[in-house]
């Protein structure tokens, strides 16, 4: 189950953080200031979780900004404050472009990067090539929308990213997961209440089986 359902998240967490386990929990949904939903039709695939977000939004509209990154106009996208309808398969470029803008605006968390990360220079060299104009054209979105979402990562506190099979079930899924985690590491949006990269499991016990060592290479 874990190998078929969300193996990209497994590999992405392990490569980026050294351990296969989301550094977030469901309670973070109640405390995030920004919820970025990428590659997930949460309204239909995780309805209980999505209703939890909407109830909070309805109770205090200014407390939460919902961003949806999805080529499709899903029910999830219809409820978003910002919908980035990127061209299919371009979300890794989008994440690199957002990281580029965080760096350009000096929005990186220098202290966090120095204390808790490594290989910053190679990452810097990659994302600096993904300029806003290049990314906007590649993804098929307005450049202003790209800038608006990138600003949320360094101008707002408590950014929580959530994804599921739209990211995981693809050839470059692990790279996209790492790109998202890198964006959180760059901006220091991790390891604090209401912030972090949060993979949503697609099937029952996809996480529990891994926690119990139920993967072939761990037996």
Regions found by a protein language model. Give the residues of each.
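Short, intrinsically disordered, charge-balanced linker/junction segments flanking boundaries
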Residues: 212-219
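Cofactor-pocket helix-loop regions in the catalytic cores of large enzyme subunits
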Residues: 1-205, 209-211
